Regions:
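Active-site glycine-centered loops adjacent to acidic/histidine catalytic or metal-binding residues
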Residues: 199, 225, 389
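Glycine-rich phosphate-binding loop of actin/hexokinase-like ATP-binding domains
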Residues: 215-273
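Short glycine-aspartate micro-motif
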Residues: 80-82, 90-94, 150-154, 219-223, ...
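Ribosome large-subunit tunnel/peptidyl-transferase-proximal elements
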Residues: 456-485
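Glycine-rich phosphate-binding loop and adjoining helix at the ATP-binding site
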Residues: 111-218, 352-363
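Short, acidic, Ser/Thr-enriched surface-loop or helix-capping motifs
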Residues: 106, 163, 233, 475
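ATP-binding/phosphotransfer module of carbohydrate and carboxylate kinases, centering on a glycine-rich
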Residues: 1-69, 73-118, 122-148, 256-257, ...
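Hydrophobic "anchor" residues
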Residues: 111, 168, 238-239, 480
Length: 485
């Protein structure tokens, strides 16, 4: 996501202009293959300016030529350009209260390898870092990459975290982690640059970029699992708060006379609807004689599997949905989002939970804040954490500050491939020749890493009539072209 100041006529920084044009070009290619002439038309730049940038991107390995397109019978066939999604790798880590997952992603946030193991967050930081180091090495080996090809590491954790420093801040569900600097510790362990955020924040990014609500600018993502938290996306940007504590919906009091939760707040949402609370409730009702066919002992897995078929399980999920809806109505009235997406393990209860959430939230929300707000289940499932970590890393890399680092990684990956190809060419053939590769497949692309604001500004040139530029001033300096009203 490009979040740079736009150059003006007063401060003409040619390097900044070129960097911005480069990022806009990469954004276009991130969404599909294009010819140079298409890019020039889309960005309102001269062909010479585009060719200069493309030549540079090809030289570092970020862009590649992938074939030609018919010219309609007139002129030469246009060469298509493609973003090389394997030019750099991303290491995405989803650290939950009871699991750890590490994925190696390409630049489209598609998984190249994935490892998930049970892990109790209560085991503490050092045991967790050791495990993550082992999983990271195994995941990179499985993906066939070296650490030098990894541009960034992104990790989501189940508690409040200061995104700028990577330090955990008063996490109710991470005992022994308060004040722990995850960013610094993992950088020392992996010898790679690390970004850290709350898991619910990353869920919000994932659903807005890759889920059913892709492109949505105002979205609340509620992750309901061992704990309950929310990621708040406003105007396409995460709202983290002053210290990273925004979105702690699980600690909103929905009943001042209710039980005290882990945060110490009476009647908090987590004390009514967190995973272990629901299991304890179901066991107590089963012991009191409530009719049920749930297998003994009652577990979260059993409650999820029989959400629609067992009367006790259904009642538990309907009550949980009611309580979630009470808290969600607060977020609707505060932020007036376009969508609320429910993810996390509890969302696997499906329509039983969702129906109760909608009924409860709608009954408590002003009409202006609910009429056009959709409340849905997440569509990314267990992949939301790693996909969100990937989006966070793209937002850091595809910026003027991150671009030089991405260039360096891409050059390294290109050199590594060249050495491997040279070695393979000298080796004697083994077995029959491989079949010819199939024609390059096309896949539906997620929304680009540019915000809506940047798209509006970057597409202004192509919306103007080409013959009637009103009051435009042009500076042509070398291979740079800046169009200003």
């Amino acid at each position: 996501m490009i979040r740079t100041e736009h150059p003006t006529t007063d401060t003409l920084d040619l390097a900044a202009i070129r960097a911005r044009h480069t990022l806009l070009l990469l954004d276009l290619l991130w969404n599909g293959d294009l010819a140079r002439v298409d890019i020039a038309r889309e960005l309102g730049l001269s062909r010479s300016a585009i060719s200069s940038i493309v030549t540079e991107l090809i030289s570092v390995g970020l862009v590649q030529e992938v074939g030609t397109r018919g010219s309609g019978g007139v002129g030469r066939r246009a060469t298509l350009l493609n973003l090389n999604t394997r030019a750099a790798a991303l290491l995405a880590i989803d650290l939950g209260a009871s699991h750890a997952r590490v994925d190696v992603l390409d630049l489209h946030c598609q998984s190249l390898s994935s490892l998930t193991v049970p892990h109790d967050i209560v085991s503490g930081p050092q045991a967790t870092y050791t495990l993550l180091g082992t999983l990271s090495a195994q995941a990179m080996r499985a993906a066939g990459i070296q650490s030098a090809q990894v541009a960034l590491v992104g990790i989501g954790v189940p508690g409040p975290v200061d995104h700028d420093t990577g330090r955990v801040v008063q996490p109710p569900n991470m005992p022994g982690w308060d004040g722990e600097n995850i960013r610094e510790a993992l950088q020392n362990r992996l010898n790679l640059e690390v970004l850290v955020d709350n898991d619910a924040n990353l869920g919000a990014l994932a659903e807005a970029r890759f889920g059913a609500h892709r492109g949505t600018q105002d979205l609340i993502y509620v992750k309901a699992a061992t704990g309950i938290g929310a990621g708040v996306l406003l105007g396409g940007r995460l709202h983290r708060g002053a210290r990273g504590g925004a979105g702690e919906i699980g600690h909103i009091s929905i009943n001042e006379q209710g039980p005290v939760g882990r945060s110490g707040n009476p009647g908090s949402l987590e004390s009514y609807a967190a995973a272990q609370v629901l299991v304890t409730l179901a066991r107590a009702r089963r012991a009191a004689g409530a009719p049920s066919q749930l297998p003994e002992p009652v577990t979260l897995e059993g409650l999820l599997a029989h959400a629609n078929t067992d009367p006790l399980a259904r009642a538990v999920w309907e009550e949980a949905g009611h309580h979630l809806g009470v808290a969600i109505s607060t977020t609707l009235n505060l932020f007036n989002p376009q969508a609320v997406v429910i993810g996390g393990r509890l969302s696997q209860a499906g329509e039983v939970l969702l129906g109760a959430v909608r009924a409860s939230a709608h009954a408590r929300t002003m009409r202006i804040n609910v009429d056009r707000a959709r409340i849905d289940l997440g569509t990314l499932g267990v992949d939301a954490g790693v996909r969100g970590a990937g989006a966070m890393m793209l937002d850091s890399l595809f910026t003027p500050r991150g671009l030089p680092h991405l260039y360096g990684i891409a050059r390294m990956a290109q050199n590594t491939r060249s050495v491997g190809e040279a070695s393979a060419s000298r080796a004697p053939p083994a077995g029959p020749s491989p079949p010819r590769p199939a024609e390059r497949a096309t896949h539906p692309r997620p929304v680009p890493f540019l915000t809506e604001e940047h798209h509006e500004k970057s597409t202004a040139a192509r919306r103007r009539p080409r013959r009637h530029h009103q009051r435009l001033r042009r500076w042509q300096t070398g291979d740079l072209l800046l169009v200003v009203r």
